[in-house]
Swiss-Prot record:
GO terms for biological process: chromatin organization; regulation of cell cycle process. PANTHER family: BTG3-ASSOCIATED NUCLEAR PROTEIN BANP, PROTEIN BANP. GO terms for cellular component: nucleus. It comes from the Eukaryota. This is Protein BANP. The gene is banp. It comes from Danio rerio (Zebrafish). Keywords: Cell cycle, Chromatin regulator, Coiled coil, DNA-binding, Nucleus, Repressor, Transcription, Transcription regulation. It holds the Pfam family BEN. The lineage of its organism: Eukaryota, Metazoa, Chordata, Craniata, Vertebrata.
């Protein structure tokens, strides 16, 4: 049998083995406990990421749906606004017939005849005018892409080019402020260009349209030039005498548009007086010419456009008052090309007039001194030549006579002194009768008119073919009509107040 000491050792070994197994079991259990929470946390993180992604997707879908709904509402609103604009245009009469403005063939004495060509006619909305006459009209291009599409559809169809031109549409605000005074036409130089989205597409013309004309703008740049009916001689005269951009613009306006056309037109073609629109092609030509000659800015061009509108308003007021619309610089100018009713060209008529020198006689009862109008300077002074055909008579000693011309081209008769050098000085108005003749022979012995202040509004002398014409004047007596040696018929129309007489050629 085993001793007691051996049994104790066996028991200790067994207890030690049991403790060792228990420790291993604890370690395994601890390891299992530590692994299981780790796996659970990983599963929890994966589920949270999935839920966040799904939430973001749902939010994105909701936002897209709302944006689609807003876009649909905006489209409906746009269609509604477009319909309202069309109805408003219909009410305002903007979609009626095209506004047509006759062009001037360069003649200072009248508008273009029926045989001349009208280059460009545009309505008041955004339009396309191309060489083959586009069939569609765009009332309001919404984006730059649509404008580029319009240009691509029109440019390149013919040999001519289409240019984008902004046309002003502002109303004539100053019409309500006009008092009839000429000083009301002063233009403020502090104006700035206004934002204007109205765009007109026009087609530039070519040299074939006006073979005897000239180019406005840079003739070497096809996009910055316009062919106009102004003759090379007139264009040289304009370039020589016009030292500022504004003066050149207003001078070109007189050459391109007759004053009668200016009186019923403006740049926009709008206003309470129902005015027409000046030809945008020629207005663009003036713009190109000023940019080329003077290198002006857009601000300068805006002020010049104001001056052009002001000039048109001045012509309109003068027309309303019945005053002359004659241009001062054109008073002694013969049109270069103008067809007459009987087929005789203006060049032949000009040659006949040159060969037969004419003079207008201003007779101041019983004169012995004769002077002839030679030239009216820019300062308004009249330079005269002695031994001419201006008969001055019955002027009391110490009194004198002069003929002056105002800024609008009106000739006025005053008491003046005629010096030895041919210069005259203004004093006060005399009494006047007027006779026209082709020669300086034959004096005038007649009594004066009853008018105290005579204003010659418009005088144009033509070829004399009838030497038996009569002077028609209500204030002249029959005896006076019999005594006057008249070589050319002139109408003397005396106003109701008996103070103004208008002298005009028959048929003018």
């Amino acid at each position: 049998m085993m001793s007691e000491q051996g049994l104790v050792e066996i028991v200790q070994i067994a207890v030690a083995d049991l403790n060792h197994e228990g420790h291993q079991t604890d370690v395994l259990e601890n390891n299992e406990d530590s692994d299981q929470p780790g796996r659970k946390r990983a599963r929890i993180e994966i589920s949270q990421e999935t839920s966040i992604k799904s939430m973001l997707i749902s939010i994105s879908q909701a936002i897209c749906q709302r944006l689609d709904s807003m876009e649909a509402k905006l489209q409906v609103l746009e269609v509604t606004c477009r319909g309202l604009v069309e109805k408003l245009d219909t009410v305002m009469g903007k979609n009626q017939s095209t506004t047509q403005v006759p062009m001037v063939s360069g003649s200072p004495f009248g508008a273009t005849q029926t045989c001349d060509k009208v280059r460009c006619v545009v309505p008041q909305t955004n339009v396309i005018v191309s060489g083959d006459r586009a069939k569609t009209e765009e009332t309001s291009p919404r984006t730059s892409d649509s404008l580029e599409n319009l240009l691509s559809n029109t440019v390149g169809r013919g040999r001519q080019k289409t240019i984008v031109l902004k046309v002003p549409v502002q109303e004539e605000i100053q019409d309500d402020q006009e008092s009839g005074s000429e000083t009301s036409d002063s233009v403020s130089n502090s104006g700035q260009p206004q934002n204007n989205n109205n765009v007109t597409l026009i087609t530039l013309n070519s040299e074939e349209d006006y073979p005897t004309g000239t180019w406005l703008g840079d003739e070497n740049n096809p996009e910055m030039r316009v062919r106009c009916p102004v003759s090379p001689a007139d264009m040289l005269h304009i370039s020589t005498n016009c030292r500022t951009a504004e003066k050149m613009a207003l001078t070109l306006l007189d050459y391109l548009f007759h004053r009668e056309v200016q009186a019923v037109s403006n740049l926009s073609g709008q206003g309470k007086h129902g005015k027409k629109q000046l030809d945008p092609l020629m207005i663009y030509g003036i713009r190109c010419h000023l940019f080329f000659k003077f290198a002006i800015t857009e601000s300068d061009w805006y002020r010049i456009k104001q001056s052009i509108d002001s000039k048109c308003r001045t012509a309109w007021r003068r027309k309303q008052r019945g005053q002359s619309l004659a241009v001062k610089s054109f008073s002694r100018r013969t049109p270069a090309s103008q067809s007459s009713s009987d087929g005789v060209s203006a060049a032949e008529t000009s040659a006949i007039e040159t060969s037969t020198q004419q003079a207008l006689h201003y007779a101041l009862a019983g004169a012995t001194q004769q002077v002839q109008i030679h030239r009216i300077g820019e300062d308004g002074q009249v330079q005269v030549i002695p031994q001419g055909h201006l008969h001055i008579a019955q002027v009391p000693q110490g009194e004198q006579v002069q003929i002056t011309q105002d800024s609008e081209g009106n000739l006025q008769i005053h008491q003046v002194h005629v010096g030895q050098d041919g210069q005259v000085n203004v004093l006060r108005g005399p009494q006047l009768i007027a006779v026209a003749s082709t020669d300086g022979t034959g004096g005038v012995d007649a009594s004066p008119l009853q008018a105290n202040d005579i204003q010659v509004q418009y005088v144009q002398l033509g070829t004399v073919t009838d030497h038996t014409g009569a002077v028609q004047a209500e204030a002249l007596t029959p005896a006076l009509q019999a005594e006057m040696d008249v070589k050319e018929a002139i109408q003397l129309q005396q106003a109701e107040n008996g103070e103004v007489v208008q002298i005009q050629m028959p048929g003018t």
